[in-house]
Regions:
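Phosphopantetheinylated carrier protein domains
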Residues: 44-66
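Generic structural marker for isolated residues within well-ordered, non-membrane alpha-helices
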Residues: 13, 30, 48
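Thiotemplate assembly-line natural product biosynthesis machinery
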Residues: 1-25, 78-84
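Phosphopantetheine carrier-protein modules
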Residues: 18-38, 55-63
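Catalytic nucleophile serine of serine hydrolases
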Residues: 41
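Residues in well-ordered alpha-helical elements
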Residues: 25, 45, 70-71
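C-terminal structural segments of small proteins and small subunits
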Residues: 65-83
Length: 84
């Protein structure tokens, strides 16, 4: 990833913490979205919106369905940024 992609990923983490009222230290790569962070299906829709805000692209529904952890989300954000 280049510096711009790193900045966007950091911006994504900040948005994630703010939007879902999470402590930044809770956004560990292994943190499970539903079980550990207590996100629900409405939050999942908001998460897709945050991903689009950061990358300018919609996440593929199939890929989004497989996202379970913060690390999974970050990998998808990186993939979308690389493929800009």
């Amino acid at each position: 990833m280049n510096a711009n992609e790193d900045e966007r990923l950091e911006y994504f983490r900040t948005l994630l913490a703010e939007r879902f009222e999470l402590a930044p230290e809770d956004l560990r790569p292994d943190a499970r979205l539903y079980e550990d962070l207590d996100l629900d299906s409405i939050d999942a829709l908001d998460l897709a919106i945050v991903i689009r805000e950061v990358t300018g692209r919609k996440i593929d529904p199939q890929a989004f369905h497989q996202v379970r952890t913060v690390g999974d989300v970050e990998r998808e954000v990186r993939r979308l940024l690389v493929n800009l």
